[in-house]
Amino acid sequence: MFPSPALTPTPFSVKDILNLEQQQRSLAAAGELSARLEATLAPSSCMLAAFKPEAYAGPEAAAPGLPELRAELGRAPSPAKCASAFPAAPAFYPRAYSDPDPAKDPRAEKKELCALQKAVELEKTEADNAERPRARRRRKPRVLFSQAQVYELERRFKQQRYLSAPERDQLASVLKLTSTQVKIWFQNRRYKCKRQRQDQTLELVGLPPPPPPPARRIAVPVLVRDGKPCLGDSAPYAPAYGVGLNPYGYNAYPAYPGYGGAACSPGYSCTAAYPAGPSPAQPATAAANNNFVNFGVGDLNAVQSPGIPQSNSGVSTLHGIRAW
């Protein structure tokens, strides 16, 4: 059997590779711890101004976790050993607590913190102002004019609606007012007149026209119905002027001697009582002696001369009338 060759340490063994990973992890943890420690020990100036200054009691009292961090850093291997074991591997050196971080400028961090604090204070102030009710602006009291002042202003306004500056100053001095008060009064008065004219114009335009007079109702008799005259057959109508037609009383005339009174009916028919007349052979003599003739109204119309027009043709429709 051949003797085993001497074991020479090589940087590529499993143990060396595992040790390398552990060393890298420990170095990363050390860098993170150093960053935390630096943030704990170096607060910003804005934060320091917000708190009361206290007496310094040492790094252990200021940072409670400082001893544990130091113990962890002490157990970590030194960077020199790592560099000697792995010459080609990059070396990681833990930064001291007092060394500034080149990637982060402490002044920039302080500026950022101050800006954030100012923004927070500004938002808080705006919120307080929004919650607090705004004080209402106090209006100036209205100027109350006396009756004498108003009377004088109205009288001057009727004479002159626009005043120049000297005239306004003179009127103000007489009424013991300021020029501005007189000017404002005249402006308001002119505006009031303008509004009154506009209202009157609107009233005239919107006024409806007067209603027409009511139609007069006139009673008109029906003369023809279905092509036939219907004045005599129809019922008597009431005239528009309330003129009534009453039957004529024939008994008002004195009766002739030897004859009885005529008995008249409301239908315009009269029957007279005649004495015993002569024989039928002498009718003309008896008629001449008695001077009475019985005839109808239609016969009377026929006796009229043909030259005179018959204006009242409706008389012939009254039947049963006899005259003597």
UniProtKB/Swiss-Prot annotation:
Its main location: nucleus. Keywords: Atrial septal defect, Congenital hypothyroidism, Developmental protein, Disease variant, DNA-binding, Homeobox, Nucleus. Changing R216C: In TOF and ASD7. One of its GO terms (cellular component) is cytosol. This is Homeobox protein Nkx-2.5. GO terms for biological process: adult heart development; aortic valve morphogenesis; apoptotic process involved in heart morphogenesis; atrial cardiac muscle cell development; atrial cardiac muscle tissue development; atrial septum morphogenesis; atrioventricular node cell development; atrioventricular node cell fate commitment. The homeobox domain binds to double-stranded DNA. Gene3D superfamilies: Homeodomain-like. InterPro entries: HD, HD_metazoa, Homeobox_CS, Homeobox_NK-like, Homeodomain-like_sf. SUPFAM superfamilies: Homeodomain-like. Expressed only in the heart. It is found in: Nucleus. Residues 138-197 bind DNA. The lineage of its organism: Eukaryota, Metazoa, Chordata, Craniata, Vertebrata. Changing N19S: In ASD7; somatic mutation. Changing S45P: In ASD7; somatic mutation. The gene is NKX2-5.
